């Protein structure tokens, strides 16, 4: 499965996940044991959070990759949480939640009220949290450190995907900032 993470052009389905499924099936009892192990792997809860209101293919790629890891819970930052560190969202939180609910592979959508993941981790106890690797430094680093500490208390894992630096995503962001800055779009 590591090759799937390196290249989106492959689709290899693993029969063993970190030795959690390895075993011989010689009789019905073995099959029952292996089936139970498979269900445990599939039942893992995976959490990923978004503040975006402009969904692009990079976001969909993260969702697709995260969904491979288990039941995908998508957190949508509240309007207030988003506005606390960047502009007020163009699309209200309830609409953004509806948008994510309609995406294949999303198991549940919840609202995240703060930049901290603490309340989410305590409430949902995810086995895996997925995030872009862009929070290793800067203002998000303390939140990352908190996530690592909270997950380590019960054996949860943080999976960080490389943050996309594709120019087309930067263009979408720049275009939306430009449109928002035009006098016709400003209100007093």
Language-model features: locations:
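Nucleotidyltransferase catalytic core that binds NTPs
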Residues: 36-188
């Amino acid at each position: 499965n590591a090759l799937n993470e390196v290249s989106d052009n492959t689709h290899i389905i693993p029969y063993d996940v970190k030795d959690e499924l390895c075993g011989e099936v010689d009789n019905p009892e073995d099959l029952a044991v292996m089936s139970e192990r498979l269900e445990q792997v599939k039942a893992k809860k995976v959490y990923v959070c978004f503040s975006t209101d402009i969904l692009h293919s990079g976001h969909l790629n993260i969702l697709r990759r995260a969904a491979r890891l288990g039941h995908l819970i998508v957190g949508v930052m509240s309007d207030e949480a988003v506005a606390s560190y960047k502009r007020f969202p163009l699309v209200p939180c309830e609409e953004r939640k509806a948008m994510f609910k309609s995406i294949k592979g999303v198991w549940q959508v919840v609202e995240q009220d703060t930049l901290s993941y603490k309340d989410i981790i305590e409430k949902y106890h995810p086995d895996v949290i997925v995030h872009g690797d862009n929070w290793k430094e800067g203002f998000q680093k303390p939140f990352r450190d908190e996530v690592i500490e909270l997950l380590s208390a019960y054996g949860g894992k943080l999976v960080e995907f490389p943050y996309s630096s594709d120019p087309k995503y930067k263009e979408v962001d720049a275009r939306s900032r430009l449109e928002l800055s035009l006098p016709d779009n400003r209100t007093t």
